[in-house]
Amino acid sequence: MASRPDGDVWNIVDNDKDSQHYGRNFKFDFSYISSEEIKDVGKDYVWQNYRVGNKVLKRLYDEIQNHFKWFSMFADTNSIHSLRKLNNINIDGFVSFLHTTIAPKRKRPLAYTSQKVALDTLKSVIRWCQIHRPNDVPATEIFTGNEYIGVNRKLKIDFIPDDVVAQINEALKKEENPYLKYGIIILQSTGMRIGDLLKLRIDCIKPHLISGYTIEWTQHKGRKDKAPMPVRSECVAAIEKLIEVTAELRSEADEKDKDTLMIWRVPQGRGTGSVSVISPQTFSQNWFRDFIKYNNIKDANGDYYNLTSHQFRRTLGTDMLSKGTNINVIQQVLGHSDPSVTKRFYADVKDKE
């Protein structure tokens, strides 16, 4: 498809074989944007970034379908029909709008992170236009850069406390869901992202040239293959168990999923009975929530621990730094694009412990 699609509704299939959403159809619906001028900018932003590969399709979908809608609502309320005349007063108004908006589904104020990502999406669209459509955006700077920096800023380091790790490990001994049990062991051992875990291949383990084994996987966020990394025997055993558990399902899986480790037979809901890759929501929301409550895993305040998949990644990095591991080695293990990214997340860990 060489030219921009017509109409307000686009169906674009992710044909990037390195994408964790390969084969998924993304339905873009721009009809919620009232202003034809702003709508045209939004369409161009999506199409041009997709066409040249600047952003993955899922990222563009989230930006336009989930995050940009808040600005569209603000624009409608304030009779804003163009990005060209936006100024800092409008941006302050948008921030106030985000502070006071009630999310329709949750019936609660927007979370701080949701507010920030809504503003970041607007920034991203305007920054792109400054290069590619300069006549459609303000010529002067309208963002101060500190709209969402302050007392409400979320602490970046979010590792799992040692006492909670101990509770998790004890609960894993009797966990009957093999995907959850062995998946957590893999996350603990490698620090990989949840999307990479769910797209792990059955041939990811290779013998090390000297001793033991290494693991390889595709880092979908950075769109590159991870360099072979030495891995503990527990992780190797976990992967072998999952290969064994899923062996009989492979003949029923789609061709693109036959060599994916985390396939299962969908027990209920859409696709019941079919064999497919486990979704991030099933693994890191539904299963984590049930795992924590069933095993009564609580934090220091006596509340159920709010476990996320990314915390295993942060915990691995924190443990390595606390043991004196060089920041560049941690960067390589976690697959950060640059050591500065690793330093930003982990430089002050010891002071916070």
Write out the residue ranges for each language-model feature.
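Charge-rich, intrinsically disordered N-terminal extensions
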Residues: 1-145, 151-154, 167, 171-172, ...
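Extended accessory and catalytic-adjacent subdomains in large enzymes
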Residues: 142-353
